[in-house]
From Swiss-Prot:
The keyword Mitochondrion does not apply. L-homocysteine binds at I433, G434, S435, E486, D601. 5-methyltetrahydropteroyltri-L-glutamate binds at R16, E17, L18, K19, K112, R517, C518, W563, E607. It comes from Histophilus somni (strain 2336) (Haemophilus somnus). NCBIfam families: met_syn_B12ind, PRK05222.1. This is 5-methyltetrahydropteroyltriglutamate--homocysteine methyltransferase.
Length: 757
């Protein structure tokens, strides 16, 4: 027998049922019991899908109303004391307030789950944090699954990863010090699961794939010795998102009953564990991407393992299937429009079926599933040989780029003189980050056009009307460098993906980003080409309305890559450079059209960093090259801007400087300009625009607040190189607050200009 299991399942439902129910509940349009009933039905469906595919264990406890790390904070009594809630008697409303904030307390901070596009709620640890076991979340789900007749495997994030993912708050201390009192609470929680008749428990320790300090790594031995001794169940330690080869000796000696390895992200690590003498769960189906596996190739890896391990071989996805859309079968439009691409994809339900086929092949031989294996091989061969994917002219263009194609003609010191000469901007020039409010009217017009209820001419006229409004409002405010407001863009990545060859879009390919927020990433399936200009006519039209400088707006290659499902048949670095080269055609067309200030947004550069620091340089090198390629060939007097909206720059500042953008705008208002200090210490050489107010809030900042931030900025950045702008795009704001916020920004800027003149 070969055991097949999954590490976790999507929570939101095939049609985002949980999202819509949550949002109705928050609007007080749905009763609590109705939300609980819907969640129960979703869990039952998830288990049935696994059971129908002959999974041997159902993943239990992975379902959450918001986030699995928030559930663990509740289960360990580690919810922030500042809310004043009792974790043992927490109501559903209070649970959501932890995630979303309330009138007295801001929400728990959210950040990326390792290097995925999912976000978790960051535990807040204080020196005096007291943990208390509250296993209700897991126990209830075990009982539900058992009533439905399922064999269960509860899933819980392990104590070291849980602590690692948190942050110290209040008095200075190291959260590692809390481990000794956290472990007994885990023992209590796990024993509550054992009391429900649980045989196996999956404990996730993805922190093993990052650069852990030595004391953390060493702690695994004692922690798992305690859990093994005091919990009467078999423990499966799950690692994923990267290689754990460096910990192979430690992991093989841990007193656990099984180990899960991610053999998609790090297939090379298998060699280090082939002599493992307990259960080895092989993560062979990609839990993070949407490509169908070549099952014959996977069996070539599994069959020798099966021979060696026998029943100790388990098979699974590489990680939780939370990161993949639910069901490919509902993508009838994609099947009709691009049947070849459709045949190369596998969503959650298809991945579970792939594992089912592998299980049968390992138990009964390949002949027992030859129809399925043949279909898998046909799809793999068709994809490898498709002319739609592989366009020789793209590879040729990349191979024949001139030497130093990604370098500007002259250094910044020379370029800026040429730019200043024609721009003729005042001291502390002002601009916005790009988007302006997306009103209901804009969204309605876009939806009507997509449905065919609005002609192209009618749609374009409504967008032009909106662009004119945005231009006139900026002129009234007396901003220096204007933008067209991006009314025609639904999303900063999807908009470009729809206009570039090599991209496709699903209709129901949603994945959870956090809570009720889901995203539908584009699919990059082939070589990337820009068939025609994408933004030129809009920017050109906007420029025709004003004598002021108009800024062109593009999303950068790294961000497009990071926020998409990316093809896995060529390196990500190659895909990124293809996007950069395609964007360079757009940049040169904008320049030809008279748009000589062009912003290339890269909010995702940091989140693309590999988990291990040893791999950072390679990534930053190709990411930087792709960004610079996107503006290759521009004249020295064309000014390239970039925008980044994240909070940690210190450790990658040399790479940010190496992008060589003439102007960088960054999100700094919420950190009280602290981020800017790093730029000052580093002596960042080019122009910089730190955000002077937080656009994520409708609140209008006071003149004193903006002046305080600008004066702090002037202490770090020479006045000749300082720009003034909001933190981020204004798409989500209303018009009245947008105008009021920008008015304050402009009045403070003018006051300081007069003072500095």
């Amino acid at each position: 027998m070969t055991t097949f299991h999954v590490l976790g399942f999507p929570r939101v439902g095939a049609k985002r049922e949980l999202k819509f129910a949550q949002e109705r509940y928050w609007r007080k349009e749905l009763a609590e019991q109705d939300l609980l009933d819907l969640a129960k039905a979703l869990r039952e469906k998830n288990w049935k899908h696994q059971a129908d595919a002959n999974a041997d264990f159902m993943a239990v406890g992975d379902f959450t109303f918001y986030d699995h790390i928030l559930d663990l904070q509740v289960a360990t009594g580690a919810i922030p004391a500042r809310f004043g809630f009792d974790s043992k008697n927490l109501t559903l409303d209070q649970y959501f307030q932890l995630a979303r904030g309330n009138k007295d307390q801001f929400a728990i901070e959210m950040t990326k789950w390792f290097d995925t596009n999912y976000h978790y709620l960051v535990p807040e640890f204080h020196k005096d944090t007291q943990f208390k076991a509250n296993p209700t979340h897991y126990v209830n789900q075990i009982r539900e699954a058992k009533v439905a007749g399922h064999q269960v495997k509860p899933v819980i994030v392990g104590p070291l990863t849980f602590l690692w993912l948190g942050k110290e708050k209040g008095e200075s201390f190291n959260r590692f010090e809390l481990l000794a009192q956290l472990v007994p609470v885990y023992v209590e929680i796990l024993n509550a699961l054992v009391a429900e008749g649980t045989e196996w428990i999956q404990i996730d320790e993805p922190a093993l794939a990052v650069d852990l300090p030595k004391e953390w790594v060493n702690a695994y031995k004692d922690v798992y010795a305690t859990l093994s001794e005091k919990v009467n169940a078999k423990l499966l330690l799950a690692t994923y998102f990267g290689s754990v080869t460096e910990h192979a000796t430690l992991l093989k000696e841990l007193p656990v009953d099984g180990l899960h390895l991610d053999l998609v992200r790090a297939p090379e690590q298998l060699v280090a564990f082939e002599d493992y003498n307990k259960v080895l769960s092989a993560g062979v189906i990609d839990g993070r991407n949407i490509w169908r596996a070549n099952l014959n190739t996977v069996l070539d890896v599994l069959e020798p393992l099966k021979e060696k391990l026998g029943e100790r071989l388990w098979i699974a996805p590489s990680c939780s299937l939370l990161h993949t859309p639910f069901d490919l079968n509902v993508e009838t439009q994609l099947q009709e429009n691009n049947p070849a691409l459709y045949s190369w994809l596998a969503f959650t339900l298809q991945k579970v079926q792939e594992l089912s086929v592998l299980k049968t092949a390992l138990e009964k031989g390949r002949n027992a599933v030859n129809v399925e294996l043949d279909a898998s091989q046909v799809a793999a061969d068709a994809r490898a040989n498709s002319k739609e994917i592989h366009r020789p002219e793209v590879a040729e263009r990349l191979a024949n780029l001139p030497k130093n194609a990604d370098q500007r003609k002259s250094p910044f010191g020379e370029r800026i003189k040429l730019q200043n000469a024609w721009l003729n901007l005042p001291l502390l020039p002002t601009t916005s980050i790009g988007s302006f409010p997306q009103t209901t009217e804009i969204r309605r017009a876009r939806a009507a056009f997509k449905k065919g209820d609005l002609s192209l001419e009618e749609y374009e006229n409504s967008m032009k009307k909106e662009i004119e409004l945005v231009v006139r409002e900026q002129e009234k405010l007396d901003l220096d460098v204007l933008v067209h407001g991006e009314p025609e863009r639904n999303d900063m990545v999807e908009y470009f993906g729809e206009l570039l060859d090599g991209f496709a879009f699903t209709k129901f390919g949603w994945v959870q980003s956090y809570g009720s927020r889901c995203v539908k990433p584009p699919v990059i399936y082939g070589d990337v080409v820009r068939p025609e200009p994408m933004t030129v006519r809009w920017s050109k039209y906007a420029q025709s309305l004003t004598k002021k400088v108009m800024k062109g707006m593009l999303t950068g290659p790294v961000t497009i890559l990071q926020w998409s499902f990316v093809r896995n048949d060529i390196p990500r670095s190659t895909v990124c450079k293809q996007i950069g080269v395609a964007l360079s055609d757009e940049v040169l067309d904008l320049e030809k059209a008279g748009i000589k200030v062009i912003q290339i947004d890269e909010p995702a550069i940091r989140e693309g960093l590999p988990l291990k620091r040893a791999d950072w340089d390679t990534y930053l090198q190709w990411a930087g090259e792709a960004f610079r390629l996107s503006s290759m060939g521009v004249a020295d007097d064309t000014q390239i801007h970039t925008h980044m909206c994240y909070s940690e720059f210190n450790d990658i500042l040399p790479a940010i400087a190496a992008l060589d953008a003439d102007v960088i705008t960054i999100e700094t208002s919420r950190s009280d300009m602290e981020l800017l200090t790093a730029f000052g210490d580093f002596k960042y050489p080019n122009d910089i625009g730190p955000g002077v107010y937080d656009i994520h809030s409708p609140r209008v900042p006071t003149a004193e607040e903006i002046e305080h931030l600008l004066r702090k900025a002037l202490n770090v950045v020479p006045k000749e190189r300082l720009w003034v702008n909001p933190d981020c795009g204004l798409k989500t704001r209303g018009w009245s607050e947008t105008i009021a916020q920008l008015e304050v920004m402009m009045s403070v800027t003018k006051k300081l200009r007069a003072e500095l003149a």
